[in-house]
Amino acid sequence: YLVLRKERREQQMKQYEEQQKMIQETKDFIERFKGTYSKTLQVQSRVKMLEKLELVEVDEEDTSALRLKFPPSPRSGNYPVIMDGVGKTYGDHVVFSNASLTIERGDKVAFVGKNGEGKSTLVKCIMKEIEHEGTLTLGHNVQIGYFAQNQASLLDENLTVFQTIDDVAKGEIRNKIRDLLGAFMFGSPEASMKKVKVLSGGERTRLAMIKLLLEPVNLLILDEPTNHLDMKTKDILKQALLDFDGTLIVVSHDRDFLDGLVSKVYEFGNKKVKEHLCGIYEFLETKKMESLQELEKK
């Protein structure tokens, strides 16, 4: 079935591309001769033909079997992140204080808590983007890959979607660029040839996510990565992160995404950072909560 489906899709793609070429040639003809009296009938008949034309449809890419593989990355030291008494204040406002934690190589951890309690602020401290109190040490050979909603604004606006990914893809994943784009909802030829400058906010976010997944890093920090992803794409991303052999920090309110992915939870609240050595469901059980959104109400 999968072979037949693949063959049918390839056939459709060929027909689609031929039809698009024919449409473009017809439009060029109409444009060139629309004011020419001797060509009036030909122009009119081609306009009508375009109006009646049934467009070739291409089956959606079946991405269910797509496994994203991170590129091999250099091994980091045993303790990628060590914090001792780390805190952050803005004037009189204390965001959090005295955070002491150790993240080991290969750990997959979640930062959870209501908005404004310092999750993204601590990420910025790790990224060395802002000053802080206390000591924060990054381990030997740590190479950070960072995703936040604003990463999308750093993309080169003059490149197409395909070029953006083609520039960073190395090794065998190069043969899967089309599948990869399809998995993140850029499957059609038009979508992959769009310039970054015309993409919506959600599309830019998804593109920035693919780009990050292709870079060889050993500490991945994702700040609300699932905001613009559908269920299928979330699953593909989650599977890739499960296969990732580096260290992972995820800031998220998405219980289902974190379930089975993280084995340590850092809870931000009351100006403190508290460590829970468990998965997300066990954490919610201890809190007598159904979802992470309930933390907002506390």
Regions found by a protein language model. Give the residues of each.
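ABC ATP-binding cassette signature C-motif
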Residues: 1-14, 65-298
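ABC ATPase nucleotide-binding domains
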Residues: 10-34, 39-48, 285-298
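Residue-level detector of short coil/turn "hinge" positions at structural boundaries
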Residues: 37, 57, 186-188
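ABC transporter TMD-NBD coupling linker
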Residues: 42-64, 108
